[in-house]
Amino acid sequence: MLVGVVVIAVIGVLFYWNSYLLGSRGDDPFTRGPYVVGLTSTAAEVRFLGPDPAKVTLTALAPNGTSVVAKGGKFVGLESGQRYLWTATVDGMGQASGSFLTAPTDPQAAVTFGVIGDYGAGNAHEYAIGRGLAAIDPSFVLTCGDNSYLLALPALYDRNIFTPLHDVMAEAPLIVDLGDHDTFLSAGGKGIADAVASPGDGITYTYEYGPVQVVVLGVESSAAEVAYAKAAFAKPWNGPRFIVTHKALKPGDPLLAVIKGKVDAAFAGHLHRYERRMVDGVLNITVGNSGEGPGNPEFTKQTPEAVYSTMDYGFVRVIAGPAGTKIQMIDEAGALRDSVTVPPR
């Protein structure tokens, strides 16, 4: 009898504790994000979907204790090279937070960024990649295309992009190259580019973050992309420089002659592998292993000129600085699988 009373009393205490003392975390009012876009040395933007924007206040806190309130989601008047903590409140209650590192103005500053490709599957592997990316605290994340499978339908953006990469996108903008799965429907690629605020037309553009420059060329090196690259590389750039196409460059590709000696590396995806290759004197890094998976082995064969090749899931960390550029492939379990250091140009 006494044991029964004690059991009932304990259950009652636990019920009261869980219901009234612990309280409820409540539902997340944001259906997308918040996530960072448009990051420069003095400005940043945080976007979201869900609550009425009139009820949301975005505040960025600098290391020195000063704060800036966003207008229309945009922070201006920021200090360069500083990590800001941002908080989103809804009706005065903090509901989301993150941070971003404004671009440095020091040409000798080192910049860390991530690279992924063929990732937009919304599966457990992509979530693992997203967690790994967040752990390296990148300034931005470059994608090598195929951001959404099988098509870049707006209804799939959250499943394939914004939810798996939620944590890293709360601190680093996604610099998107479009792949053939993204552009199969023309509106799909444009929708992704608009959502992440890609510069220009969202297909061919140049992104600059401090001393780092990335030239984004879309699916492959057609005549229009080669012409864009010639114009871009005709302009001097003293810092680390990169190029990205969705489909990897092959020996004899006319783009290789344009970029030889002018880039630290050329990134690509499409092949669902990670590969490191030297092609006509240019370091090529294929990052097609970030979520979708290898598929049919018949169509996922190692490239003949590959120095290193694997179908294991992973992402790339790039540390670019005045002493050179270190490019590392990290697998979904957090192990370093490949590393190469590129001396300054």
Sequence positions of predicted segments:
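Extended active-site neighborhood of metal-dependent phosphoesterases/phosphodiesterases
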Residues: 35, 67, 85-101, 154-240, ...
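Conserved, compact domain cores that house catalytic/ligand-binding motifs in diverse enzymes
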Residues: 110-183
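Active-site metal-binding loops of divalent metal-dependent hydrolases
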Residues: 115-120, 145-148, 180-181, 219-220, ...
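Short, motif-level signal for alpha-helix interfacial/capping segments enriched in acidic residues
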Residues: 124-125, 247-261
